[in-house]
Amino acid sequence: QADLSDLKRLLDTMEIDEYFKEFLGLCRERGHRVYVLSDGYDLCIEAVFEKYHINVPYYANRMIYDGSFKIECPGTNPACGICGTCKTRLMEELKGEGNTVVYIGDGYSDTCPATRADVVFAKKDLYRFCRDNGVSARYFTDFKEIIIYLKSLQ
């Protein structure tokens, strides 16, 4: 059975996209708001953010350790219940009036918000979903491609 120190050792091996911090810098420079909407766990996100000195608001499920791991899903949508964090509801709440949503994702929990975002960058399972369901999406391999797109806007 794993404990908190085992999890932290595992999380310390995780890496982020090599262009992610450059992407964040460009967004800050241009006044674009960035949020991480995750169906993962706060404990994991915090560990990765701390390792890479990232300060971005995020929404995720809660992982609580008090001798054993417990999960809380404060962002679930009771009417749906598919994901622990309803990214679509959060995206709509955070969008604000007249703003364009550029949604970046790769997994199953990104499928619903991808159908409602203005611009979608997708890879892996999300790209397959978009392709198979007629959702307009730009395939990406890394954040460098998203940086190029953002720079082309101005």
Where are the regions that the model predicts?
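C-terminal cap/substrate-recognition subdomain and adjoining C-terminal extension
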Residues: 18-35, 40-154
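Metal-dependent phosphoesterase signature
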Residues: 1-22, 30-32
